[in-house]
Regions:
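Short glycine/serine/threonine-biased micro-segments
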Residues: 121, 134, 175
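Gly/Gly-Pro-rich "capping" loops immediately C-terminal to redox-active cysteine motifs
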Residues: 43-51, 139-169, 221-224
Length: 274
């Protein structure tokens, strides 16, 4: 046990090891978010391409951890890769991927939450500078014939496309890039705070209706509690919808509240990010 603790402390102090561990954690976040698109609740294959990608991501994450002297965590990912190959039910694979991403973040002291409230105005400016060319100024990517890329960029303006994404996943993509796509890493070009600003702004693009947002703000003023930016950072729109389903609000009002909380932070405990 002492040996593993020493290895963990040395790895956490090694910038190269932290970078590799960050990529591993990001890969597992993709698996947690997309495995249910590849495999159905009874183990049926929904998308062979997605399933192959999920297995590849887990194995790449294991390789990153072995290069970071985290053989114990890599061994657990070998087991997870076997469960992906066996088409295990989504709750099992998603839960294990999330747990492993958390363990990696804890061991290597990764920044998985914003240190202060993100700045949406700065996020908008950064989005226009760094993201609009591929993802579109309003979150709708240009037609494929105008932008020939190996994969279609995420449509941030699409509610269905964005339903499973959290700011944390967008932050990971901006930090480490996305394997097999044209999405580069902005880890060196943007500060940690700027990447969080960008991630939070991207989640607003599927909620652009001014009337819907105004209705949501009205409802939030009557709410006894509202989520802060730390809670919003790790939750996808679908997770927020599930929480709102217990509120007694109509479906339209739930969407309005979701729009409002993505656009502002009514209960923010911090100051603007640096």
């Amino acid at each position: 046990m002492t040996g593993w603790v020493l290895v963990a402390l040395l790895a956490a102090a090694d910038p190269a090891a932290r970078e590799r561990a960050g990529r591993a954690s990001a890969l597992l976040s993709y698996v947690a978010g997309d495995y249910a698109v590849a495999v159905g609740p009874r183990g049926e294959i929904l998308s062979p391409e997605e399933l192959a990608e999920q297995g590849q991501f887990v194995r790449e994450a294991a390789a990153e951890l072995r290069a970071s002297s985290a053989e114990d965590l890599a061994g657990e990912l070998d087991q997870l890769a076997g469960r992906v190959d066996a088409r295990a039910a989504p709750p099992e694979v998603i839960g294990r991927a999330q747990r492993m991403a958390t363990l990696i973040a804890q061991r290597f002291d990764l920044a998985v939450l914003p240190r202060a409230q993100p700045d949406l105005r700065r996020g908008q400016r950064l989005y226009r500078q760094a993201c609009a060319a591929c993802h579109g100024p309003d979150g709708t990517p240009p037609p494929a014939e105008r932008l020939p890329l190996p994969t279609r960029p995420v449509a941030f303006a699409s509610k269905p496309d964005m339903s499973r994404l959290s700011p944390q996943r967008v932050f990971s993509a901006a930090t480490y890039g996305v394997p097999g796509t044209a999405m580069p890493s902005f880890g060196d070009a943007l500060t940690l705070g700027e990447r969080w600003d960008l991630a939070f702004y991207a989640l607003t693009l599927a909620h652009k209706g001014a009337r819907e947002r105004a209705r949501g703000e009205e409802l939030l003023r009557k709410a006894p509690r509202t989520p802060d930016f730390l809670q919003l950072a790790v939750r996808s729109d679908d997770q927020l919808r599930a929480a709102l389903s217990r509120s007694g609000l109509s479906p339209a009002d739930r969407e309005a509240v979701l729009s409002a909380v993505r656009a502002a932070f009514p209960a923010s405990p911090g100051r603007a990010s640096r």
